[in-house]
């Protein structure tokens, strides 16, 4: 291990020659992480975690603080970019069999859960209408836990309803969790370099490797530059493209928005939750929609690592991508036919991808077996 650390330090880490642009998302995520920590740090200097002042402090940041509007928009758009990159990163891992590197995959799934928790706490902080009601709906799911549910919810809220203590602790959690993400990212990278990256062919890369620097550093810099330009263009010309109009109104516990929904990057999980007409069942499906990723290394039965030469699994993968998009779309719609039916069918297909993984692997082995 010390030898590998020295190689990383001098940029001489041996990396497969044939890894494609799909392997660039790791460095893009690192850039997003740095951007979020920096902008978040400056925003926290001017933010006030109090239900009477939080909304006003956001207005103060955007209007009165020098470049505050840029910091606030960079932080909001940066979060969306973070999730775009992480979903692409996970899709790459699923397609090219990166999940067979078990420890790396399990640490990565833990990172995803931590990131989703951080983003959820952050969405509550502006104390707008959608912030308040999204927090109410999601935290209320804890009450579905038998016996302990109500006690856990009261403990999380710091009272009998979402109030000042809730906002204060959500701000504290939103501030501390990114440091956990950074620590876990270091573990993720160290575990990755134990065995090295996979490659598009799913073969052993040991026979054909090149130094990480300068080849992959320049390749990374190109996509990082493209990502930063995209973020800056969005911040400059479409800063509110991801915002919900409801969130421009201060939180009012007496007025319920017509359609409560979280940020776009949670819509697929929220859509799965809504598709089940039972509180506990929906909450379990919500948790399982993320946790099912943990099963992938243990259900792989194919002799081939990558999906490059697995047509049946390729079909299921692209069905999963389409399903993910459909669930995200239906979650933005009212809870009424045909949207409920569409999201129920799409949710079943979503879980079918993971359940069919061992069966399709076994079938492909039978088809490709040479006598």
Curated annotation (Swiss-Prot):
Its main location: mitochondrion. Heme b b566 binds at residues 89, 188. Binds 2 heme b groups non-covalently. It is a multi-pass membrane protein. Its cofactor is heme b. InterPro entries: Cyt_b/b6_C, Cyt_b/b6_C_sf, Cyt_b/b6_N, Cytb/b6-like_sf, Cytochrome_b, Cytochrome_b_C_euk/bac, Cytochrome_b_N_euk/bac, Di-haem_cyt_TM. The keyword Transmembrane helix applies. Heme b b562 binds at residues 75, 174. GO terms for cellular component: mitochondrial inner membrane; respiratory chain complex III. Keywords: Electron transport, Heme, Iron, Membrane, Metal-binding, Mitochondrion, Mitochondrion inner membrane, Respiratory chain, Transmembrane, Transmembrane helix, Transport, Ubiquinone. The chain crosses the membrane at residues 25-45, 69-90, 105-125, 170-190, 218-238, 280-300, 312-332, 339-358. It is found in: Mitochondrion inner membrane. One of its GO terms (molecular function) is metal ion binding. A ubiquinone binds at residue 193. One of its GO terms (biological process) is mitochondrial electron transport, ubiquinol to cytochrome c. Gene3D superfamilies: Cytochrome Bc1 Complex, Chain C (1.20.810.10). Heme 1 (or BL or b562) is low-potential and absorbs at about 562 nm, and heme 2 (or BH or b566) is high-potential and absorbs at about 566 nm. The cytochrome bc1 complex contains 3 respiratory subunits (MT-CYB, CYC1 and UQCRFS1), 2 core proteins (UQCRC1 and UQCRC2) and probably 6 low-molecular weight proteins. Component of the ubiquinol-cytochrome c reductase complex (complex III or cytochrome b-c1 complex) that is part of the mitochondrial respiratory chain. The b-c1 complex mediates electron transfer from ubiquinol to cytochrome c. Contributes to the generation of a proton gradient across the mitochondrial membrane that is then used for ATP synthesis. PANTHER family: CYTOCHROME B. Belongs to the cytochrome b family. This is Cytochrome b. It comes from Candoia carinata (Papuan tree boa).
